[in-house]
A protein has these predicted regions:
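Cofactor-pocket helix-loop regions in the catalytic cores of large enzyme subunits
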Residues: 1-159, 164, 168-171, 180-206
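Extracellular/periplasmic loop regions
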Residues: 174-175
Length: 206
């Protein structure tokens, strides 16, 4: 159903190759694929357009996009306030940041940010596909919230082909239900950032 894929901080051509045929099929039917990434990745090269902000400025870009949508499109603020928490505080945060600061932080021209925001708003339905790179900076969780809020502002939440996606890692849930009654030892964990050395250092469970 999606008519626009906003691929933000994600390189599915390398990390999610199973996703690319679906995106290519949608593009063949007229959908757009736009990549937001500081790096000109393989996915960006295969997309309709790439937007390349300064590393770590994704939250500022999301605020700039929100400012553009609020200024140039009929955002349904009363409806959003009724179905969300702290929307007034969010609007205050967006309003408090001057667009000039957004431009300075992201190293992007105003025209690019406004084009990205209004293309995302106008193309229906649109989905945001976020990657895990966005969380590798200070205020990473807040950055995800700012990006998710764009889906609410544009009205892409709760519609087929819309939404804001972040990869779900299922194994923390699975370990609670798989053969739980046959456990003889507590579950072990290995840091993802040191997966190879961590696995090499493990021993057989007792």
């Amino acid at each position: 159903h999606s008519r626009l894929f906003l691929i933000w901080g994600r390189n599915p051509a390398v990390t999610n190759p199973h996703m690319m045929p679906l995106i290519k099929e949608a593009r063949a039917r007229g959908a757009l694929a736009i990549v937001v990434d500081p790096v000109r990745t393989r996915t960006a090269r295969d997309s309709d357009r790439g937007v390349h902000p300064r590393p770590g400025s994704d939250g500022h870009l999301a605020i700039g996009m929100a400012k553009a949508m609020l200024a140039h499109r009929p955002v349904e603020c009363p409806r959003i306030a009724a179905i969300s928490d702290h929307f007034d505080a969010y609007l205050g945060l967006v309003d408090a940041m001057p667009m000039d600061e957004v431009l300075a932080r992201t190293d992007l021209p105003r025209e690019t940010i406004e084009w990205l925001a209004l293309t995302y708003y106008d193309t229906r339905p649109a989905t945001i596909l976020q990657g895990i790179g966005l969380q590798q900076y200070t205020r990473g969780a807040q950055t995800y919230r700012l990006i998710a809020a764009l889906g609410m502002l544009a009205g892409h939440i709760g519609v087929p082909g819309g939404g804001v996606n972040f990869g779900n890692w299922p194994w923390p849930r699975m370990r609670h239900v798989v053969a739980e009654d046959r456990r003889t030892a507590a579950p072990r964990t290995v840091p993802v950032s040191r997966l190879a050395s961590g696995l090499a250092a493990t021993t057989d469970p007792a």
